[in-house]
């Protein structure tokens, strides 16, 4: 943020995105490619490969949620950095509940430091995640500082 000599505040848009999966299911071992972008400031999230690329070094907040496919007993998803390491080793675990006949959903938030050029993606590590136009499976994030 800068202030001009005329007193105007110039605050460039911070990197931010909010994306969903509009159709299809994603099975274990695959990156979830969120193909619908409701917000993509700076176009740092790719709807073709499912990765967010940090444009600058800083602290980022990420959130993601998913609906488990009803045909799978357990589903797990994790946030990965640079195609390999899990961030904070946190995961979403979605289990069947005996009282419902449809998939279960859950969400989480993660804050982490990234360097410029680092990538972040959401990967299914067990089971199958459901995607639909209802936006049950989503991912988003933004630069905090």
Language-model regions: role of each:
Residues 5-145:
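Extracellular jelly-roll beta-sandwich "head" domains, especially the C-terminal globular C1q domain
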